[in-house]
Structures are given as C-alpha cells and as structure tokens.
Amino acid sequence: MGDTPRVVFVDTSVMTCLLDVPGKNQDREEVIPQYQQYVDGGVTMILPVTSVVETGNHIAQLADGRLRREAAIRFDRTLAKVESGVAPWIPNELTWDPAMVGRLRNSEVTGDDLVERLAQKVGAGDCMILAERAEYSERSKIQ
C-alpha cells in the first residue's frame, strides 16, 4: 500500500463532498476517488463528532428548503449506516473531560496553542478535530 495511511480522520470537508452538500461539495470529484482508494485499501476511517456537528450545521444553513431536506436525508441515512456498523468508517469515541479541553487548548500535533491557531484563522471545529485525533492516537497507540 506504500503511502496509504492505516488510519484517517474524516474531515468535515470530506463529509460534505461525500454527501454532496450544495456549496460545500466543490472538491467532490477529487474526494470520491481518494475515499474509494481508502475503502478498497482497508484504511480505518474515523468519523469525529466534530465532523458530524459541522456537517449538520452546513446542511441546516442551506437556504433552499428542498435542497436542505434532501441533504438532511442523505446525512441521516449515512449516520444510520454508521450506527449499524455498515458504513466504512467508525465513530470516534470522545470523552469531553479536562484532558480533552487540554488537548484542544494545547496541540501537540501542531505544536502551538488554541489562541495561535484561531489567530491564524484555523476554526474551532478544525482545532477540535486535531484534539480528537490526538486523543485517538494516545488511546490506540497509532500515530
């Protein structure tokens, strides 16, 4: 498999492309083949709670009610597959505790802190995904 990772976290931008969320799907043609390569390669794909929340927010903010409902249905069907274990990714087990708050505030992954990341226009959702990834790495011992 060469450069194929063993574990990846599914980012919000990937979820919105896979779900074809209008206005958030501009990289869909690039994301689908990469996603399929991961599925075919047996890569463990972790679905962070932050990606679920952000994707739901993007769907809820769609102006067109018909498109909003269609995207919401796709989102719900996808989450049902995750819940039943038939989706190719698994939900990240997240404990919201002081240690997680510490990971959010001080990232070992990026080597800087929350203030610096926000000042560099890195959103809180992306910061939380990094914190979730750090927690997963600690728990699983997979880097």
Where are the predicted features?
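Structural element of the ATP-grasp superfamily
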Residues: 77-78, 133
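Short beta->alpha linker loops
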Residues: 50-51, 128
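Short, well-structured N-terminal submotif of metal-dependent ribonuclease cores
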Residues: 1-50, 58-76
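Generic short alpha-helical segment signal, independent of protein family or function
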Residues: 60, 80-83
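Active-site neighborhoods of divalent-metal-dependent phosphate/nucleic-acid chemistry enzymes
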Residues: 83-143
